[in-house]
Regions:
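Catalytic cores of enzymes
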Residues: 1-146
Length: 146
């Protein structure tokens, strides 16, 4: 958490690969587990991020509680409220090897100049050749600016 607090506000890209917890009973206490503690969704409201992309490579980081008015509460909302332009989030737990394959291709596509949404789509389609079942390659979605 301390390293995140120190480096995230001035980082253009944030990639977090860790364990996550979604709390449907209190989604603002959904969090990411770091070596020195939890970063909760409600903590993110105290940050000012200026990042092009935040990738939350952990189980169910895209999970959210839908409240009246179609308000979504969870880690996504916290990162977007803090200023992240876009998020790559997981919709379900995915195998580490398949996630690695998607992420390597995703960042390679971005580095070649592809927009974030197209980069993730291509990465998933390429990974589909190696891992046939959608469980492996379709876990990630892009939220925010594409």
């Amino acid at each position: 958490v301390q390293a995140f607090a120190q480096h995230a506000p001035q980082s253009g890209v944030i990639h977090i690969a860790t364990h996550a917890l979604f709390r449907a009973d209190n989604p603002l206490f959904s969090g990411l587990l770091f070596a020195d503690g939890w970063l909760f969704a409600h903590d993110l409201y105290d940050y000012t991020l200026d990042c092009y992309l935040a990738t939350l490579s952990a189980c169910r980081t895209g999970a959210a509680l839908v409240e009246p008015g179609d308000e979504l509460f969870g880690l996504m909302r916290g990162f977007l409220a803090a200023g992240a332009q876009s998020l790559a989030v997981s919709l379900w737990p995915a195998a580490d090897a398949a996630t690695l394959a998607v992420m390597v291709r995703f960042y390679s596509n971005i580095a070649s100049g592809m927009p974030r949404g197209a980069a993730l789509r291509r990465a998933q389609l390429e990974t589909r050749e190696e891992y046939k079942h959608p469980y492996h390659w379709a876990a990630f979605a892009l939220v925010g600016a594409r």
